[in-house]
Amino acid sequence: MSEEIKKGLLGIVVDETTISHVVPELSALTYRGYTVQELCDKCDFEEVAYLVLNGELPNKNQLKKFIKQERSERKLSKQILNDIKKMPKNAHPMDVIRTCVSLMALEDKDTKDNSPKANMRKAMRIFAKTPTAVAAYFRSRKGKSIISPSKNLSFSENFFKMMFNKVPDKEIVRAFDISLILYAEHSFNVSTFTARTITSSLSDLHGAITGAIASLKGPLHGGANEAVMLSLIHI
């Protein structure tokens, strides 16, 4: 028997996921059994977020409740906003997001509760507050005043408002909504693996998301998109 140690995880099935699947032979990506093409044609981003988190598309009442909850969790504390203002202006935005999620953990009343219900509450808070953190840093590093989130705008509309102090035409908002749907899930990738490795030690959800964001930053994962954008800007 060979004593050679095979390093890495190539060809090793670590676990399975029921959330998202890449189907190369069909050039398709599915979320909970729905193709992204179908979801982009028929759904808003909030509906897809509900689908990913809950396993099924919402009815009208479920969607209304989900949207109300998300909008109620958008605000960041004064402490976190002050911390964002103190962050270096040349910091990488992914490092800022990662740090903000860690700061959220320090304030979240459910941080030490790893029950499914508590994790769902924490997931909603992270989901709602992350765009606020992104926009706050974007404006702070440019020397502009931070714009508070609105409870009267959709997820995408609110992000534009916090970033640029205006909501663009519906076509642009819809295009951004579709981009969020396309980036919502991508099967059992390296950031998902990282998050699940962290939670396997019974660590908290914020820690898992922090690790996943650090992984996503890498040039062999989400960082590849950044490299493409920088190349396009250069060209």
Predicted regions, residues:
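Hydrophobic alpha-helical bundle cores within soluble ligand-binding/oligomerization subdomains
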Residues: 1-233
